Amino acid sequence: MPIRTSLRLAALGLLAIFALAAARASHDPVIRIPASVRDSLNSVWSLANTHWNEISDQNTLTQALGTGKPTQKEYLGCLIGDASADTFRVIGWIPANDMKRFQFAVTGNCDSVPGAIGTFHTHPYRAAPTGDRPLKEPGLSQQDLTTFTGGTDRVLVVVWDVDSLDVALRAADGHVVHPAHLLPR
């Protein structure tokens, strides 16, 4: 086979791969969260971390055993909005029903909340293993994603710092996309 033909076939193959990837990316779900809602999520996170500097004398084991100071606790809220195909729009949120807040977990439900499309929760600072400083828990944890994948919600958001969100979305065909694209508003 002449070199020119081989190069053309290789180029066509690459073009096909890029086209498939672009088609898939264009169909992945996206979410829009207006600034007013993001500001209120930031406020919840800030309030949940008011005493972050009080864990500098704690270590991870102390916190995990529950014998440390539970200065911060996770928070769970129900995201209210709508979806058009795989584009989600959040218009507000309310606290989850039956919420139980713990240092490294939160429980509650949004089952009876009209217009709920998913949940958000906060990740508070935690103690470093050595206890010399607080650490951030950036992003959704593997446990968060496992729970989301096994459920029916279409949206999962974690707030892990002011203006720091991580998002997982369930597409209309059921596949979970993480990290999902958060569109500015």
Regions found by a protein language model. Name each.
Residues 2-11:
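Bacterial N-terminal signal peptides that target proteins for export
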Residues 122:
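Conserved residues at the C-terminal ends of beta-strands
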Residues 21-116, 125-185:
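Conserved beta-strand-loop surface patch within small alpha/beta domains used
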Residues 10-19:
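Bacterial N-terminal signal peptides
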